[in-house]
């Protein structure tokens, strides 16, 4: 394995890490805001219906008055308008539920607060998906251009390449990995989370808990999903960056890659078993011989270019090929990407 390529991959890993850390700040902020809004919803509910800061389950199951139902339906219209601002597509199921709610003639207090909590949860997941999509788009472009640049500078020759459009990145994101795409993975726990939120709420009513005690239980339930979301984001980032590198290899006529696991100080057994092995680009299979192989996987690939050195001789003067000097990445972007 070339030290040159190991150093390049280490640099790329650092750049990707910066994107991940920035996303995690956003994710933390989103979850904290969701918890804050759920607590506010709960406080309003207790202020309206509690006696001595307690609400019985029987009290919670009482039907809303016509005035309360009318106010709820106005809120539902606001929910629909706000959720339509997000690009996330999996919000549609809840939007359909909201549309149905506008025609209901009987709704209980418990159903009303659960609808409000589900709105907050849906808004959280939609925000999370939009933020992850943005991170993945940046990661894909960064990995793609970095790989093409390093190949061209190393070989001294380049091949015309297609710039990764937003649609191309979205297509890569929507490809199923282990049976699901990244959006499905974000939303798959929504029903379970919602059921757990309702369970904690119902337990609070049955046990005579205060709004503060119930709010703590709701926050704990939501925070349990945060760590899963963080793991998902890092694993999918590894996936999208390796997909981008693979496409970059193909764009420069590189036909083989080497599996590289040693950049990860906590290398798993499955990744160690593939470290240093060479595979054909045309036979790359995610989760099999192309990272990620497991959650939090940090393995990557490097191009096998020994057999491609003849590109320097063969390419000069041919259409679609051009000589590349020892230029900086910034200069390369200006000459070949931003032109």
Positions of predicted regions on the chain:
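Activation/maturation switch segments at domain boundaries
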Residues: 1-136, 220-221, 227, 234-339
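Structured, charged N-terminal subsegments at the starts of enzyme catalytic cores
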Residues: 98-219
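A broad detector of short, well-ordered amphipathic alpha-helices
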Residues: 202, 231-234
């Amino acid at each position: 394995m070339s030290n040159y390529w190991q150093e390049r991959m280490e640099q790329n890993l650092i750049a990707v890490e910066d994107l991940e850390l920035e996303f995690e700040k956003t994710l933390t902020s989103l979850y904290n805001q969701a918890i804050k809004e759920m607590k506010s919803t709960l406080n309003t509910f207790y202020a309206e219906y509690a006696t001595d800061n307690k609400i019985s389950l029987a009290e919670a199951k009482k039907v809303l008055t016509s005035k309360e139902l009318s106010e709820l339906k106005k809120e539902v219209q606001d929910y629909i308008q706000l959720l339509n601002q997000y690009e996330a597509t999996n919000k549609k199921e809840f939007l359909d539920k909201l549309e149905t709610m506008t025609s209901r003639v009987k709704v209980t207090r418990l159903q009303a607060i659960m609808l409000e909590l589900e709105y907050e949860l849906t808004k959280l997941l939609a925000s999370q998906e939009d933020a992850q999509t943005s991170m993945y788009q940046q990661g894909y472009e960064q990995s793609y251009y970095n790989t093409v640049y390093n190949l061209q500078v190393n070989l001294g020759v380049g091949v015309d390449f297609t710039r990764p459009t937003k649609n191309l990145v979205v297509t890569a994101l929507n490809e199923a990995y282990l049976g699901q795409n990244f959006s499905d993975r974000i939303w798959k726990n929504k029903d379970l989370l919602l059921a757990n939120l309702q369970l904690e709420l119902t337990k609070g009513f049955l046990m005579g808990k205060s709004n503060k005690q119930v709010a703590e239980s709701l926050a704990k339930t939501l925070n349990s999903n945060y760590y899963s979301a963080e793991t998902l984001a890092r694993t999918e980032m590894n996936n999208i960056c390796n997909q981008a590198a693979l496409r970059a290899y193909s764009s420069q006529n590189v036909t083989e890659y080497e599996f590289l696991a040693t950049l990860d100080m906590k290398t798993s057994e499955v990744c160690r078993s593939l470290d240093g092995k060479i595979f054909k680009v045309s036979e790359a299979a995610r989760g099999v011989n192309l990272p990620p192989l497991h959650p939090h996987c940090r393995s990557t690939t490097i191009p096998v270019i020994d057999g491609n050195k003849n590109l320097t001789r063969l390419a000069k003067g041919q259409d679609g090929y051009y000589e590349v000097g020892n230029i900086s990445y910034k200069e390369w972007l200006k000459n070949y990407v931003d032109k």
